[in-house]
Amino acid sequence: MRRTPVALTALALLAPLSACAGTAAAGDGATVTVTVGYQSRTINTVTAGTLLRSLGSFEKQLNALHDGHTYKVVWQDYATGAPITAQMTAGKTDIGSMGDFPLLINAARGKQLGRPTRLVSVTGYNLRGGLNTIVTAPGSPLSSLAGLKGRKVSTSIGSAADGTLVRALRRAGLDPDEDIHKLNQQPAVGASALVAGSADALSQFVAWPGLLAFQGKAKALYDGAQLDLPTFHGVTAREDFAKKRPAVLEAFLKAQAEATAYLNAHPVDAAEKVAKATGLPAEVVYLYNGAHGIATFDPALKPQLVSALKQDVSVLKDAKLTGDVDVDAFVDDRYARRALGAAYATSLAAVPPPAASEAWDRGAARTRAFATPKELLAYVAAHRSGVRAAYVPDATTGTLWFADRAVWVADGDALLPFVAPATAQAYLGAHPGARAVSYGQALEQAS
């Protein structure tokens, strides 16, 4: 199994609290309101949002405080991290979850407006950058980033997906400011623009690329993992809230650890829960959050993630979205260390193993894992009507993708999947005996 579950340790009840959180009134027996901003459809934040909420873990942890207060949790659902930051810097939201680039803007705005925030934990991450993907229309002639010159590309400026677009274009020798027409759009608007033909490509974060590919409305043009730079989502808290209500924040982080453990132990059920809450297809949720999904969930603030965050600052500065950001001052793992105890060190040391090919049979509570993509294809070929979804890892980046949406290459007896055509072409160029095959041909060869 791909995940490294976070062990939950028994912790003593914390001392009574004396100050109020968010909009709560102070005083013994008062009702304390804790406001949590989350992004239900940004499914790599589910352990601090959608899944956490559906499990009721935070409320249970608050009830266990027994500090004389009654707690009320207000959940606020947003499409992106920007409005969460706006609410936090206005003192109206206590805890929020968002991607790495929005987290930096959160840090910058908080300091600028005198409402400093702190990054306290991580939700979903991918050490190579596979959470972001550039897609184009299914019938598009585009097969590489070079073809984007002079074209319209939709993204959300200031998002991790925009960061991926900027870096990818620069590596391809294109100027992201001069060589493309960038459309600054919300994910749903950009998806509609791609389908309508008013955008030639879309660079977005999870779950939009996978959703559009699953629906047959897009095909991958660029796999963010080609950058080989970590991307992640995390939890941020207002500094004044954390200082006044440390036990409440630690209760949230304990609840996040519970949700993480549940996702790791019950990946299919967790995907179904998130699908029910968001309206996303469970097959898409599982692509990202499954047992061998694109994302890994460990709450610890790993050094390589913090290092990547520091590298992200220059991209936002170039876009004039922030000035310098003191990442070391923004990162604060004290609350997570106290909340998780010894399990924090386990989370910090966890290394995601390579992804594996998987088949999700209809009506099954578990998926089947296969040693090679060819073995998966042989199974699918023999059980076509019984397979709900099939997943394969990119042969070069390890990014999981839908088997029927992958670009396939036959190299001798091996059948190799790729997320994007450019990586497949690179492989073909380096292996003269290899040849491109369709999904149907790959199934036939495997069987």
How does the language model describe each region?
Residues 9, 342-369, 373-447:
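Intrinsically disordered, low-complexity linkers and terminal regions
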Residues 8-18:
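Bacterial N-terminal signal peptides
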Residues 182, 188-276, 374, 383-390, ...:
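Pocket-lining segment of extracytoplasmic ligand-binding domains
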Residues 131-141, 231-247, 409-411:
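A bilobed periplasmic-binding-protein/Venus flytrap-type ligand-binding module shared by bacterial periplasmic
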Residues 43, 244-323:
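Secondary-structure end/capping motifs
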Residues 28-175, 181-185, 200, 229:
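Short, glycine-/small- and polar/acidic-enriched structural segments
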Residues 316-353:
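Conserved C-terminal helix/tail region of periplasmic/extracytoplasmic solute-binding proteins
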Residues 17-30:
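Bacterial lipoprotein signal-peptidase II cleavage site
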